[in-house]
Amino acid sequence: MNLQQQLAYCQQHQQRLQLRHFDNETAWQLGEKIKRQAEKQGVALAIDITVNHQTLFSYAMAGTCAENQDWLRRKRNVVELLSTSSYAAGLMLQQRETSLDARYGVSLRDYAALGGAFPLQIKQAGIIGSVNVSGAPHLDDHNLLLQVLADFIGLPTGSIELLTPLTPLSV
């Protein structure tokens, strides 16, 4: 899958993975679902769900460390800045051959355009926050969020195209 294909999929994902409502109980249910999926995949994650700058769910699985919390914060900041997933932001920057600090003037100590943070969007209302994970390779973090969100909103298994590592454009 090349860069253009991945960007197109990221746009589709953000359009399709919208919720009808979201409250504190929803955050708890989604966070638990992410934890169970991580356990099933054998990966230790730090998990954070933030709405309107308030943390509604936070959990650090055994095997994570304080560094994972920092990655959560940095990825979440990208969603808040650009209103797109942290993975899609990285792809857009790569396409434009630039970086967060060069394009937006932000510190890379506070922002990370790597997979693992996804906007929480309410249908017909907009983005209210983000769901964030850290602990696996960043593409795996992103794909885990796609899987869990798709299942959480009731999309059929396999209806969301998971992303694969980038391949160069063929000439």
Swiss-Prot record:
Matching HAMAP family: UPF0303
One Pfam short name: HbpS-like
InterPro entries documented for this protein: PduO/GlcC-like (IPR005624), PduO/GlcC-like_sf (IPR038084), YBR137W-like (IPR010371)
PANTHER family, per the entry: PTHR28255, UPF0303 PROTEIN YBR137W
Organism: Yersinia pseudotuberculosis serotype IB (strain PB1/+)
Protein family (similarity comment): Belongs to the UPF0303 family.
Record's signal peptide: none
Name listed for the protein in its UniProt record: UPF0303 protein YPTS_2661
